[in-house]
Amino acid sequence: MKLHDIDPDNRPRERFLQHGAAALSPAELLALILRSGSQQYNILDTCHHIINRFSLEKLSDVSLKELQQIKGIGESKAMQIVAIFELNRRLHYSRNQLRKIMAAGDVFEYMSGRIPDESKEHLFVLHLNTKNQVIKNELISIGTLNTAVIHPREIFKSAIRESAHSIIVVHNHPSGDVNPSNADKKITNELKQAGAFMQIEMLDHVIMSKTEWYSFRERGLL
C-alpha cells in the first residue's frame, strides 16, 4: 500500500502541508522521505516498525545490513535512511566544528536542544582537543545512570578512538532537579580515576535540566 492509499487526514504529506513538519512523528517524517512501501507492507507501518525496533536515538548508527532485515526495506530505502543521517551529521559538524568550551555554561549552551527525549536520562561525552574545542559529541547511553550500565572503559575507549585530549561528561535529569545522586557522584569519581590512569583528563561532569545545570568542576568536586 502506498501513501496515497491512506486516509487523507492521516497522510503525512497533507499533514505536513497543513500543520508543518513539527506536527509529524519521526515515523511519519521518515515515511514522507521514503514515499512508498511494497505490495505487502504499508510504508507508514514499516517506518513505525523501524523507529520502534531501533529507536530514533540509535537509528543514525544502524547499518545498511540491519535496515534491510526490516520487511519492506530494500537496499535503496536503506541507503536513503543512512544518507539522511550522514547529511545531518555533516550539518551538525559544520555548525559546531571546534566549538570551544571554557565553562559549564558553555556546555549547557552547546547541549541545549540536543537531547532527543528529555523524559529519559541520556549520557553524552564531549571529546575535546588541546584547545578545549569539541571534536565530537557522542551519546553513550539512555536510561538510569548507574555502574551496571556505564563503565569507564566504554567512555575512554571512545576518547582514545577520537584522539581526545580531555573529555566532559554530560547527562540530563528529567525531573528537573540537577543535584547529583549518589550514583552520579560514584561514577564521576570512577571516571576521574580512570582518566588519570589513561592520561585523558575528565574536565567536568555536567548535569542538565531544561533550564539549569550542575557542574562538578565548579562545585570543587573535580
From Swiss-Prot:
Transmembrane segments: none annotated. Keywords: Hydrolase, Metal-binding, Metalloprotease, Protease, Zinc. It comes from the Bacteria. InterPro entries: MPN (IPR037518), RadC_JAB (IPR025657), RuvA_2-like (IPR010994), UPF0758 (IPR001405), UPF0758_CS (IPR020891), UPF0758_N (IPR046778). This is UPF0758 protein Cag_1513. It holds the Pfam family RadC. Coiled coil: none annotated. It comes from Chlorobium chlorochromatii (strain CaD3). GO terms for biological process: proteolysis. One of its GO terms (molecular function) is metallopeptidase activity. A motif (JAMM motif) lies at residues 171-184. The lineage of its organism: Bacteria, Pseudomonadati, Chlorobiota, Chlorobiia, Chlorobiales.
